[in-house]
Design a protein with these regions (language model features):
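ABC ATP-binding cassette signature C-motif
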Residues: 1-147
């Protein structure tokens, strides 16, 4: 994700940055709409966007690439809580593996993780998805060793 953010072409529009031969303009605009870019917003130059808007373009671009593995390092850093909630739901349709580093438990829950590795005291502990319901009550690790 960070690489995609750095590779956005600043002098091109949002639509041009996510353009792909695999998708029609309608499909691209629909995908961008899922990341809160509507109507003529898609014709804005990337250089005019806020950091949060650039993050949304990069995340949309990542999902459109159909990679089988996504590595996301703090993908919600530049997003307000309402936008995080909307954007997080877009990852539910992704069928590959997502490795995400995040301090945002609500985003992690939204993207539908099945396992979580947490570093509560400098060592990795693995927890089940149910931990998200009791995020601040970290008492029952499934495993405390790295496999």
């Amino acid at each position: 994700y960070a690489q995609e953010l750095e590779l956005l072409e600043q002098d091109r529009t949002i639509l041009e940055n996510v353009d792909s031969q695999e998708y029609s303009e309608w499909q691209l605009r629909t995908a961008l709409g899922n990341f809160l870019f509507y109507d003529n917003d898609v014709f804005k130059k990337v250089e005019t966007l806020s950091p949060g808007e650039k993050a949304r373009v990069a995340l949309c671009k990542v999902l459109l690439q159909k990679a089988n593995l996504l590595v996301l390092d703090e993908p919600t850093n530049h997003l307000d809580p309402e936008t995080q909630e909307i954007i997080g739901g877009n990852f539910n349709v992704y069928t590959g593996t997502i490795i995400v580093v995040s301090h945002n438990p609500s985003f992690v829950e939204q993207i539908g993780i099945s396992r979580m590795l947490i570093l509560p005291s400098g060592r990795i502990e693995e927890y089940s998805r149910e931990l998200l319901e009791h995020y601040y009550d970290i008492n029952t690790p499934i495993c405390t060793d790295i496999c």
